[in-house]
Amino acid sequence: MQPFEEAQQLVPGLAPKPDLVCLSHLRWDFVYQRPQHLMSRFARDRRVFFFEEPIFEDGPARLDVGERPGGVRVAVPRLPHGLPHGEVEAAQRDLLQGMLAGHGVSDYVLWYYTPMALGFSADLAPAAVVYDCMDELSLFRGAPPALLERERRLLEVADLVFTGGQSLYEAKRERHPSVHAFPSSIDAEHFGRARRPCPEPADQAAIPRPRLGYFGVIDERIDLDLLAAAAGARPDWQWVMIGPVVKIDPETLPRRSNLHYLGMKAYDELPSYLAGWDAALMPFARNESTRFISPTKTPEYLAGGRPVVSTPIRDVVRPYGELALVEIAEDPEAFVAAAERSMRRLGEGAPEREAWLAQVDEFLARGSWSRTFRHMSDLIDGAVLRRRGGPDATN
């Protein structure tokens, strides 16, 4: 039984909420991040369908729909190799409409993570349209040329625009009448496990200390030159990099005996790795692709009780750097110095650690994923009511 069905049984007469159909450029089974946190919570009180970008393979077009833990139904379009470009969106449209009909989805909120999905969904009739802009996708490597025009059209039809950070909010707020900033939130209980003794993962156990680690996607947003220089400056420190390598050639990764690439790990495994680090890293490059990012790992590292060092990414400097929760450093020399300083001041047993952790916890308490979900859900309820012409107290 679905979580929302259980809720309806517990509260007889509870009006069902519209289903939620999410159109995403990210894979559900890839890195666990904002879409998974939010959609798994929405699935507690409504049906959620997560429609991914297509996979091209041999055979006729089909849609694989499977349920994930928590109740989200993940739909993966599989399209034939060699399908002409002009027919790809038509095939996606057919598969999406077939899914809606086959699952009896008639009253639903349409939630976009990518404006490109407008090409096969513009003729639908949702109860409300949400654009959750978690990144400035047009600045990423390989962005489709049509993306900016699609975003312009999406902003015209959306009822609500959510942004993944303050910088994105400032970039979008003049382009739509209802833009709301929802920066990276946190499951503090999950990552708080790193503050307690954890069994060492087998592939990290033999790596000496001190360990400085990163988890997340390794792509054009990582400053590989900074990483190489910092690792070279401190050969006695071990630099642990966890996550998939995408959009860059793995051969371009710096290689040293104290640099360890451990690959992608499941979300449930991350606290165990984090617990074995002496500091956590965000060695982001300063380029167009990082201009608007609001890294989810910032609060995750902090919830795990690790001192954090980051390059001056705007949404990290403000608020984390300004509140002295995170050390900010721009070049390799400053990065190494900041890491050394933060480990000395804030590491296990350090004199300032307890006061810093208290400040961290006070800050993180205001930004849980559950709190973000509730606020978003209230805004969506209001948008649905407005479309239906009913009373709305949610402004």
Please tell me what each predicted stretch does.
Residues 1-59, 231-234:
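N-terminal subdomain of nucleotide-sugar transferases
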Residues 167, 185-194:
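Carbohydrate-associated surface elements
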Residues 203-222, 227-231, 240, 365:
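Conserved donor-binding/catalytic core segment of Leloir-type glycosyltransferases
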Residues 97, 144-161:
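Membrane-proximal helix-turn-helix segments that form the acceptor-binding/catalytic region
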Residues 29-33, 222, 268-273, 280-303, ...:
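Nucleotide-sugar-dependent
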Residues 248-274:
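Nucleotide-activated donor-binding/catalytic signature segment of Leloir-type glycosyltransferases, i.e.
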Residues 347-380:
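A charged, aromatic-enriched C-terminal amphipathic alpha-helix characteristic of glycosyltransferases
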Residues 324-333, 340-348:
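Conserved acidic donor-binding segment of nucleotide-sugar-dependent glycosyltransferases
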